[in-house]
Amino acid sequence: MKTLFCIGELLIDWISTDIDSSLVDSVNFIKKAGGAPGNAAISCNRLGGKSAFAGKVGNDAFGMFLKETLVKEDIDTENLIFSEHPTTFAYVSIKKDGERDFIFMRGADELLEFHEIKLPQENAVFHFGSATGFLGGDLSETYFKALDYALEKKFFISFDPNFREALWPNPEKFIEFSKDFISKSDLIKLSEEEALLISGKKDLQEAIATFKLKKNAIVCVTLGKNGTLLYFQEKLEIVPSISVEAIDTTGAGDAFIGAVLKQICDKTPENFDEVKNYVSFANKVAAIS
């Protein structure tokens, strides 16, 4: 089994407990561990995988809480670095349909430097799923250097852009950076919104056709309750999900990618049916997460 190596932000999600309330109107919040890369690592480990996380948190009570969370999930925290800057926060409210309202307050996550990371030498799958990895600062430089390292080592590379409109009022740079990562990744997981935004198209099939892809790259476009649009080996098919009531979609995409990557860590798929089975299982994991 390969180790899933996740790099990016680990943060505190302050989640509104006021039902169907915007952040403007929310009063009550609970604290939860958050950050897409960490969520993906947790998803992988809960399914029996082996994950490691690389990122930076504050040397404060919140950073300690985040480390304890990863340790409880048996995730390798050798590359969880503590900073004198405060831990990053995200404030989240949940609407009636399960969709989210976000505000980010960046902190230590953007200060991760490449030289601080002890990189795996073999048997690794690299996952780039950071929502803040393209925003500048040391993390952005580290993100791109880690991609180059993974390419040099010929590791399997996974990319999830995790677009947040609140972070990108002007998304041109996000689109440029995402296209670069898409062209160099073996697995690309996108939401429908992300696929259309990055491609500049209005149709998902056209969007996928515009991407510059590696040979045998897997593209998964998640469609919520409608399943996942899967592209692999020039074949395109919607893989259905199971029907559940949407209460909170926070982390569902991370649960999905973690489930796909756990299976890839066990065995790199060789044909469409094998990938389809991976995605079908991941759809179910995401639906009940």
Residue ranges and their predicted role:
Residues 44, 191, 253:
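Short, conserved phosphate/pyrophosphate- and ester-handling motifs at nucleotide-, phospho-/glycolipid
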Residues 131-209, 227:
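Conserved beta-alpha-beta core of the PfkB/ribokinase-like small-molecule kinase fold
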Residues 42, 89-93, 227-231:
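Short beta-strand scaffold segments in enzyme catalytic cores
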